């Protein structure tokens, strides 16, 4: 089941279990020599349980078996509205982010705002603004029969989950 049993954003147990199982598969490929310095690993979320094993393995492996690692930074400790602030996770998460910044090849963000946030927080690795992880045309294809903007009823739609992190009271 994909229901959130523990937590407010993703199920803490389910997310951790899935991430760790994926990392287990990656570690096996690294051990087998299937992953080399020509490979690139991309994580859609900087906080991925198990990620911390990569620098441990790569620092002890020959350079030809050290893949490039990129990941997406979604908000985390630089966003005062992020759920982890509310849940009291700031201190250990900031240290986790600093650990990640020590070994990744680069960090992807959605906008220039996040570049400023990360630099202010002391991040050193290259940061790339990649925009949103989906294309405008793909989104438009999912909504049939759209009207020109001037012909639409003026109303606000709240498309996020109903969590304080997304500030639903603003609407």
What are these model-derived regions, one by one?
Residues 102-145:
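Donor nucleotide-sugar binding/catalytic pocket of nucleotide-sugar-dependent glycosyltransferases
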Residues 49, 70-87:
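A short, histidine- and acid-enriched strand-loop-helix "catalytic/donor-clamping" loop
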Residues 145-169:
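Conserved donor-binding/catalytic core segment of Leloir-type glycosyltransferases
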Residues 39-42, 68-70, 106, 155:
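Structural motif
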Residues 1-56, 60, 64-65:
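N-terminal pre-catalytic "stem/leader" segment of glycosyltransferase-like enzymes
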Residues 51-57, 81-84, 117-121, 140-141, ...:
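A short acidic (Asp/Glu
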Residues 11, 46-50, 75-78, 113-115, ...:
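Short, solvent-exposed loop/turn segments at secondary-structure junctions
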Residues 86-107:
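Membrane-proximal helix-turn-helix segments that form the acceptor-binding/catalytic region
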């Amino acid at each position: 089941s994909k229901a959130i049993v523990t937590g407010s954003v993703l199920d803490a147990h389910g997310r951790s279990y899935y991430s760790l199982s994926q990392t287990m598969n990656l570690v096996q490929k690294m051990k087998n020599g299937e992953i080399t310095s020509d490979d690139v690993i991309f994580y859609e979320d900087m906080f991925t349980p198990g990620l911390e094993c990569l620098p441990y393995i790569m620092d002890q492996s020959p350079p030809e078996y050290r893949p490039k690692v990129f990941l997406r930074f979604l908000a985390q400790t630089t966003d005062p509205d992020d759920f982890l602030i509310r849940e009291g996770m700031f201190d250990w998460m900031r240290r986790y982010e600093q650990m990640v910044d020590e070994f990744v090849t680069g960090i992807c963000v959605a906008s220039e705002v996040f570049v400023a946030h990360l630099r202010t927080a002391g991040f050193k690795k290259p940061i790339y603004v990649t925009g949103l992880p989906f294309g405008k045309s793909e989104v438009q294809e999912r909504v049939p029969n759209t009207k020109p903007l001037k012909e639409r009823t003026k109303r606000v739609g709240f498309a996020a989950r109903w969590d304080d992190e997304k500030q639903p009271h603003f609407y």
